Amino acid sequence: MEAPSAYNDARVVAAREKLASKFRELRPDHEDTRIMAAMDLAATAHDGQFRRSGEPYVTHPVEVALICLELRLDNDGIIAALLHDVIEDTEVTNAEVRAQFGEDVVQLVEGVTKLEKGVRLDGTANQAARAETLRAAESLRKMLIAMSLDIRVMIIKLADRLHNMRTLDSMPSDRRIRIAQETMDVYAPLAARLGIWQIKWQLEDLSFKVLHPKEFREITEAVAKSRQHREDELKESIRILKERLESKGLHNTQVIGRPKHLYSIFNKVVKQGIPFEQIYDLIALRVIVSQPYECYLALGYVHDLWLPMQGLFSDYISAPKPNGYQSLHTKVIGPHGEPIEVQIRTREMHEIAEYGVAAHFAYKEGERANVRGEAIAELRKQIADWSNDSSNSREFLKAVSTDFFSEQVFVFTPKGDVLDLPAGSTPIDFAFRVHTDLGLITVGAKINGRIVPLSTKLQNGDRVELVTRRDAQPSLDWLEFVQSQHARSKIRAYFRRRNRAENTSRGKEAIEAELKRLGLEPRALTADDSVQKVLVHFKQVDNVADLFARVGEGLVSVQSVAMRLRELVRPEAPAEPTGGGKNRYQAL
């Protein structure tokens, strides 16, 4: 058979050889015929097409396929990565792909193509939620729904974005910034939630370089200056620890250094206000053992060797993160008196930690797939909940921005299961996350065995126990402190179902109680001038009865009405503008 004319270009030939070599290296027991047939189809279909950099276009899908190979995606996923642009950008049809590679590949290619057709996000997820950017909402909704149908679609899309970020230099400046911001706000958090950490940190560092070039350069130079010193310390720490583990009988153990990523250093400088020269924990070790019980043995030997730092130990083996991540984390004072972070895990745990949900497709049998399968099932359930709770794309985006892209806390149920919730969540958020019916009848909570107010913010590692009563009802006050959009929507839905008269009465009582708390007389509600001035601030409210009803339904905040009345009855001087700190990165 005559070779495709695309192979007249040495760069395309080199790309094909690179793919074949990597496939044989990582999958020596697999036949590469279908993979190379997909390569040939992609080369032929994209023949004559070039990237902005001048490279033959087919080098892009090849690089995407190589990233997917590294992520341990299955062979159909690799083929789909090679063909992910052919239906959209060439004359190749679905029928041709189906005839040669089967229905599974067609479904994957179509899934990625639909994402490509989606409208680009115009700004960050959080900004889009605040501005209610409909196009952003539609795009993100499409992306997450595609992900829930087949996670491999999202893995291919992440690989596609990673290669585009690696080759961003040929783009105009404004487009680079837009793509980098979108990557930082959407794709990096998605990679994190899928547990694909090696993709997450690369996306963050590449985005950081574009969005904050000055700070990127400064941190890169600072890291370079101290590199030799750190490498010497790292080598010595690895040698000392490996010798100790060997002497204790852990012979088949890897001890490797793990670099701190530039964006994580930048975050520490910005969020904690620590000058770079005072960041000492730039050294991190990873210990990889054969069996789970050896993780705990190794932990004991590490703590015997070096002094552990109090309060900085986490056990994600007995209580895995919801995305399936398992490892022991500890921080110790190393041989030179500087903090060293140590992570201890088995090889299988390491696969999951590095490759996230993609590891699920590398294993088809036994327990190794169970943790990953449960994580995928939980993710699909969350996406379904967001869709069911949201009446439109804007609400969906707001829910995802709050519940998915925000920082998370990990807490325990009484049975020891782990739930992830948005940072700042309360026992009420926890209750609704477990089950809506449980949230509706919650009357109290215990955290770590101690009774606490329902507005208490949960911390990592908290064990939460709920107190319920069958005849209990939710409170409108909960809307003032719940953090998750899921809990908020369920509480509002409960009050919307009540009849209008009851909601009107409930809303009026709630406002009167809040006015008393603020030291105002409830008669402020009957002052026509005050009420009319308050009404203009609330959309879709025609009269005071409407206002009471919407408060009773949970659609308007009790506090917002009371504060408006307070401003009219007892106006206060405007607050003084607050001054800025001295952190050199404050404006970023």
Language-model segment annotations:
Residues 288-290:
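Short hydrophobic/aromatic beta-strand micro-patches
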Residues 8, 13-15, 94, 102-105, ...:
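Internal insertion modules embedded within essential enzymes
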Residues 1-28:
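Short, contiguous pre-domain boundary segments
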Residues 28-33, 54-58, 71-74, 100, ...:
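Structural motif
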Residues 22-38, 93-105:
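Short, mixed-charge amphipathic alpha-helical segments
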Residues 35-37, 41, 46-83, 87-96, ...:
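Alpha-helical phosphate/pyrophosphate-handling elements in metalloenzyme active cores
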